[in-house]
């Protein structure tokens, strides 16, 4: 049986650990409610933007790049709508900067690695756009079958529309230049405080289903022109898709960390109780 000094030292160590995990749980709990409210408030706008975009594309029809002069890749909407043979796929992989969030980051990274392997098997190259320190670190050591872009670290800490626009411009530039032919986001969908799902959705080329034929919609008129409206709407749609993904990821990460730290605190409490019993038994046998 361990001596009293060793047991007392272990109890003290576990108590210190419990203080840390409990504090981290409280911090995550304080942030996650705000993150939950933000992501849920943003969803109706994203859904309505998608709905509007669907109607516009069905109304406008074909797109021509002739005579279009733009300064930003995001403004080059005809090329952003172009579908071509996929030789290189980009993956925007959204993780957190910190660990101690259960299996949150590892689940996302495993999904991305599986996608890289699937691309390799079908002869498609992969370019990784990592968001968060965990993604940057993981893909630096994950192999050589993909190109790794510079990571977006600060954006993972505080999701904003400005940060989403920075990412959107970078991937739009690579798409328009032909460096990539497609890009998907690998992120999480926040369900509730106890649940999230790792998901993937298309960003470029902009892929919008046509409206159902039986739906009766008013005729759309565009001022000053369809081109000018789409030139504003396409960048908004792409940026908002990325922003929504960042919000979903942030809420999922905080909820996962709160759950993980709650479990760690409970485990620490159980260990303290067990060690306390051992300590008392040792006292009896002295």
Q: Language-model features: where?
A:
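C-terminal beta-strand-loop-alpha-helix "lid" module of Rossmann-like NAD(P)-dependent dehydrogenases
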Residues: 1-284
């Amino acid at each position: 049986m361990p001596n009293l000094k060793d047991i007392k030292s272990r109890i003290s160590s576990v108590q210190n650990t419990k203080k840390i995990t409990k504090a981290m749980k409280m911090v995550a709990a304080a942030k996650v409610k705000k993150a939950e409210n933000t992501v849920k408030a943003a969803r109706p706008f994203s859904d309505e933007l998608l709905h509007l975009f669907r109607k516009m594309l069905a109304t406008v029809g074909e797109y021509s790049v002739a005579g279009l002069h733009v300064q930003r890749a995001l403004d080059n909407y005809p090329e952003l709508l172009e579908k071509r043979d996929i030789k290189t796929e980009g993956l925007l992989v959204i993780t957190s900067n910190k660990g101690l969030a259960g299996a949150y980051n590892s689940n996302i990274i495993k999904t991305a690695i599986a996608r890289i392997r699937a691309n390799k098997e079908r002869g498609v190259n992969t370019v990784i756009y990592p968001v968060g320190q965990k993604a940057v670190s993981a893909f630096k050591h994950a192999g050589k079958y993909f190109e790794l872009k510079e990571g977006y670290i600060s954006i993972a800490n505080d999701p904003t529309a400005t940060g989403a626009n920075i990412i959107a411009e970078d991937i739009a530039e690579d798409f328009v230049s032909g460096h990539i032919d497609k890009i998907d986001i690998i992120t999480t969908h926040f369900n509730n405080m106890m649940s999230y799902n790792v998901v993937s959705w298309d960003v470029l080329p902009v892929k919008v289903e046509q409206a159902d034929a039986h739906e009766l919609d008013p005729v759309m008129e565009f001022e000053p022109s369809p081109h000018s409206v789409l030139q504003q709407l396409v960048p908004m749609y792409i940026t908002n898709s990325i922003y929504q993904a960042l919000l979903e990821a942030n809420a999922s990460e905080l909820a996962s960390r709160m759950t993980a730290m709650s479990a760690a605190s409970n485990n620490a409490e159980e260990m303290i109780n067990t060690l306390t019993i051992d300590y008392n038994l040792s006292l009896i046998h002295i």
